[in-house]
């Protein structure tokens, strides 16, 4: 399902700020596997997730998802198959948009409420209700007004609106 072969990433190579973040890492996960990446601050956990998601190209190696080489695939194309929660609860949502608009965006509606049907809005409300934190009553509120925990819960819902092939949770509390 996910196969990482000999990837390496060095930031600022050849400078005094050179930092080897990942060196010759290989990993293989099969469908249904659950894995935890554990390490101290600065160990490269987020860098690994960033490489998988296409935030940057690795210096060496390859990344495959469902036997398809995604090493050079653009970030937006990878996002169709990868759901992600970031360490920072401020990432993963659009703070100036409403809860409903964020959910519409995650559902592939482009965030345009005029194209969101009544049935889709009801689906959003039902999914929010499952979180049991009252967000279903605040669908017209901007996401930027939510607490960090509420945003993390919303981001998890958004990341799984269309079930991803791979879900990355970049924080122990995520």
Q: What spans do the regions from the language model cover?
A:
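Walker B catalytic motif
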Residues: 171-172
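A short, proline-enriched helix->beta-strand linker immediately N-terminal to the Walker B motif
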Residues: 159-165
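A short, flexible loop at the N-terminus of ABC-type nucleotide-binding domains that lies
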Residues: 1-4, 10-24, 36, 72-74
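The feature captures the beta-strand-to-loop junction immediately N-terminal to the Walker
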Residues: 38-40
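Conserved ABC transporter NBD signature motif
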Residues: 61-69, 128
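ABC ATPase NBD coupling module
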Residues: 15, 57, 69-83, 95, ...
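Helix-to-loop junction immediately C-terminal to a conserved catalytic motif
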Residues: 53
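Q-loop/switch helix immediately C-terminal to the Walker
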Residues: 96-109
């Amino acid at each position: 399902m996910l196969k990482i072969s000999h990837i390496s990433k060095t930031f600022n190579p050849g400078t005094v700020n050179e930092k080897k973040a990942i060196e010759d890492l290989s990993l293989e996960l099969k469908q249904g596997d659950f894995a935890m990446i554990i390490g101290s601050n600065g160990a490269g956990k987020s860098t690994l997730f960033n490489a998988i998601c296409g935030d940057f190209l690795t210096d060496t190696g390859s990344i495959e998802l469902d036997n398809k080489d995604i090493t050079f695939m653009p970030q937006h194309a990878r996002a169709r198959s990868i759901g992600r929660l970031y360490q920072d609860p401020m990432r993963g949502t659009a703070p100036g948009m409403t809860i409903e608009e964020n959910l519409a965006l995650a559902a592939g509606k482009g965030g345009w409420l005029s194209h969101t049907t009544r049935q889709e809005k009801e689906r959003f409300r039902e999914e929010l209700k499952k979180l049991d934190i009252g967000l279903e009553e605040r669908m017209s509120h901007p996401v930027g007004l939510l607490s960090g925990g509420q945003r993390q819960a919303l981001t998890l819902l958004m990341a799984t609106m269309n079930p991803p092939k791979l879900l990355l949770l970049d924080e122990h509390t995520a």
